[in-house]
């Protein structure tokens, strides 16, 4: 019936095993893309730190980009090595360790983004928001440290994948609302799409958490998710260039 057909599509049971040529092409495309991504965000981050001057907002944004790129490199570099050599199943430990580290650095990324919001819109109080951000980040990191995640194996439990991402998604939702409201209230054209980049990143990430283990093709959604983060970083970089141009 229709429900059984949908189940087969989601789980990938109707898919033929990938041919060697397809696997090689996937390895090349992913590796080239990952190198481009890491070089881009790290370069932009370093340039923002160096070019920010006394502007704390853009220095934080640059640090945020460096944390993003450095953290993701722990996962993407071993992934590229695995795809180009013996395959993902033989790199369980370095890949798992990389995901573990990335789960923490991504949390730090959103905490830094919260402080970018405070600096950009000159928020002086709102201690309740700060407490909420730190609480969600702390819960997320504690959950990521639990041995039940089985990071260093090929099969991490789905239940724990969902559990550790609940506070992460709530943190992301909070940041989305803050940037959406503030950009609209302040008619901030430079940051008017910041909220959308975060929506897109989570929109592509959630299906990967839920279904990538049963259908590896869903893992390809990490590419548009990564593009959304590049957009986030470029919004900050372009805003810095525009403001520096006005001041010169």
Label the predicted regions.
Residues 104-174:
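Membrane-proximal helix-loop-helix units in multi-pass membrane proteins
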Residues 41-49, 112-117, 145-147, 167-189, ...:
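Alpha-helical transmembrane segments in multipass membrane proteins, preferentially the mid-helix core
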Residues 88-99, 153-165, 216-224:
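Non-cytosolic membrane-interface motifs at loop->transmembrane helix junctions
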Residues 71, 170-174, 192-208:
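Hydrophobic alpha-helical membrane segments
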Residues 81-84, 144-154, 206-214:
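Juxtamembrane "helix-exit" motif on the non-cytosolic side of transmembrane helices
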Residues 50-59, 118-129, 181-191, 245:
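Membrane-interface helix-boundary motifs at transmembrane edges
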Residues 23-41:
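Hydrophobic transmembrane alpha-helical segments in integral membrane proteins
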Residues 45-49, 74-91, 96-130, 236:
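Internal transmembrane alpha-helix with an interfacial aromatic "cap," most often the third helix
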């Amino acid at each position: 019936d229709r429900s059984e057909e949908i189940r087969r599509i989601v789980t990938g049971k109707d898919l033929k095993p990938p041919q060697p040529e397809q696997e090689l092409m996937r390895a090349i495309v992913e590796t080239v893309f990952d190198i481009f991504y890491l070089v881009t965000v790290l370069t932009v981050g370093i340039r923002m730190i160096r070019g920010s001057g006394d502007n704390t907002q853009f220095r934080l944004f640059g640090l945020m980009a460096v944390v993003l790129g450095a953290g993701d490199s722990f996962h993407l570099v071993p992934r590229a090595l695995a795809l180009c050599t013996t395959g993902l199943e033989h790199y369980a430990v370095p890949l798992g360790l990389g995901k573990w580290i990335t789960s923490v650095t991504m949390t730090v990324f959103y905490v830094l983004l919260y402080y970018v919001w405070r600096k950009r819109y000159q928020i002086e109080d709102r201690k309740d928001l700060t407490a909420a951000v730190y609480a969600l980040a702390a819960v997320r990191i504690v959950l990521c440290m639990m041995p039940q995640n089985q990071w260093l194996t090929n099969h991490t439990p789905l239940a724990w994948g969902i559990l550790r991402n609940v506070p992460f998604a709530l943190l992301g939702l909070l940041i989305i609302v803050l940037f959406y409201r503030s950009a609209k209230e302040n008619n901030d054209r430079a940051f008017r799409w910041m909220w959308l980049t975060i929506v897109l990143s989570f929109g592509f990430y959630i299906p990967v958490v839920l279904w990538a283990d049963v259908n590896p093709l869903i893992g390809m959604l990490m590419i548009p998710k990564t593009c959304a983060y590049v957009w986030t970083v470029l919004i900050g970089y372009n805003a810095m260039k525009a403001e520096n141009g006005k001041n010169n």
